[in-house]
Amino acid sequence: MKHFFINFFLSIFFILPKWALKVLTLRKEITYKNEVFDYQSMIYISLISWFITKFGLALDMADFSNDMRLKMSNFRMKINNNHLPKKTINKEDRIIDKKNNLILRQYSLDSQMSDKAVLFFHGGGYAISNIDVYNPVASLMCEGLDTNIFSLEYSLSPENKFPKALEEANIAFDWLINHGYSKEQIIICGDSAGAHLAASLLHDLKARDEDLPFLQVLIYPMVSPSLDFPSLERLGENFLLTKEHMKWFWHYFRAEEANNLDSR
């Protein structure tokens, strides 16, 4: 019932004009460095935060478990996504490390595609989410870019510490090379923690004096465990992802404090 309520509400929310949202919420616009926060996005994030708290799906930093992780992921997958690909997207799970059952999911089209490949890492603070949650994102990328997308189901913290995810990213990159892609054809991409993993992979390749891939695309990346950013002080509360959340993600991602100094 709660999923029906949320989906029904969101179907109405996205057709409301900006003036209607202002009348209904009475929220003021937020400006940061002379840039105005998109009003619809601001209200949407606040509402999603409220829904998550209301239905007991907020990240419990004091008592985190895999059951909570699965509950959060299942909730996200039941929320309707109005932006779905119009073309048929083919999906195939490749086992690229049989010992650890490491999955690399390939998204492709029936029609002729670009010769490039996107190696994609999902977000979630290295602790939550999975390739199933990001299935709509990867599918839309495949259709929009007319390119094969390879989405990695990397190991999550706190069960798996740094550099486990990076090691698996290297395995995925090498798998693409061994299956016909040159480095000039590979694009490394990720969002949030996935963007940090993408950047880490390139730093790791560079440290080993290896040729780098064609391009990296970092979507709102996790950047530094120092969390010393004016934007985080200004926007560190009331926007779903808080400064305390980021402290928690970084803390459980690293194996030891010395990892903060690792260039990867």
Task: List PLM regions with ranges.
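Alpha/beta-hydrolase superfamily serine-hydrolase fold, recognizing
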Residues: 6-15, 19, 92-264
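A glycine/proline-hinged amphipathic helix-loop "lid/cap" segment
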Residues: 1-109, 259
